[in-house]
Amino acid sequence: MTVIDFTAEVEKRKEDLLADLFSLLEINSERDDSKADAEHPFGPGPVKALEKFLEIADRDGYPTKNVDNYAGHFEFGEGEEVLGIFAHMDVVPAGSGWDTDPYTPTIKDGRLYARGASDDKGPTTACYYGLKIIKELGLPTSKKVRFIVGTDEESGWADMDYYFEHVGLAKPDFGFSPDAEFPIINGEKGNITEYLHFAGENTGAARLHSFTGGLRENMVPESATAVVSGDLVDLQAKLDAFVAEHKLRGEIQEDAGKYKVTIIGKSAHGAMPASGVNGATYLALFLSQFDFAGPAKDYLDIAGKILLNDHEGENLKVAHVDEKMGALSMNAGVFRFDEASADNTIALNFRYPKGTSPEQIQSILENLPVASVSLSEHGHTPHYVPMEDSLVQTLLNVYEKQTGLKGHEQVIGGGTFGRLLERGVAYGAMFPDSIDTMHQANEFIALDDLFRAAAIYAEAIYELIK
């Protein structure tokens, strides 16, 4: 029996892997609804990245299919059983605070910096090369692989909804998504966004004209800006003291009797809100000391006094812990207030374990001083694949063999395409000692981790389909 050195096989293909990855990272594939149309369902960027990925697969001799620019796939091998690999080409907005251009991939000190380097273009390319090694070595296989790539994973997953409705194929029998971390993610909490609604009236000595913070529900807002006027005694001095006390950055700009106040924190993945510093909730806390009234006061009080650092929903009274899946988490992700609007919102993204539900959370939130509470159209229920499943066991065995580290199950708050299948998990590409920069400025993947992951993917895929 021939022993295959998958690490050596990756080494032979490192330059090609990086070249393909660079071609994907150079594409700004943020969702842009302002440019969406029938040909570009989520804007032109995600389509361009999808087309580039399928072009790479075409080049390497795989049969490919583009499903109306929502998603695409290529297939490898033959067999009745199908292994699904689910990845995505869309990225969250780059935001601010980068030391390099987020769409000019840059290698520095053994790290590859770019938006999408770790979520998810880097892991996708590593996994692609894992399968490519199997193909190029001509290894015997007994199952088919369908490698599916989406374009809306970071938003509502409308890409996968459309794909499965229109592709004309049954779902794969089992599979994984290279969109999280090793050793494995075999459980994922439920995911729902709930919106707090407020009127726009101002009746106090201080006036809130607007309040804006956050880019996506699944990102911790790095910064927020409010435009205010009225009785704001010692505004600059109070801001200076506030940002010094809380180790933040802030600034005030005056224009025609109005003050534009900005506070800057730190972005993070919305599934791990404690890893960030929510600039919006801190701005609301700062402003709440002034004499606002009516819905504007309610907006600032809830944002600054209840939502601030309420990562597990204790202040909101929605906290819940499951023995296996852990605690509920809450990210206050998007803030929009305009005094001229009758409907102003705060978007709260919950990652919830078994034992609670979106409706239960909603009923509790309705006790707040808000006009109403609504649910997002798209959500996901909790998902779990038992440790005893052969898929989980195979993936853990390969991880242990290649790293020398003990494998174990994990449940996360993040949502991945792995949950699209009843027997679906997430697998890599972050290692336990990796620095997680997903959804943050200066996102990167360590090159050593990228190549290690490719070798693990190669052996894991082979073990699943041989």
Question: What does each model-identified segment do?
Answer:
Residues G72-F74, A226, G257-I264, I346-L348, ...:
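A generic structural motif
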Residues A271-A342, R351-E366, S372-K466:
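An extended, acidic, His-containing surface patch that forms the Zn2+-binding/catalytic region
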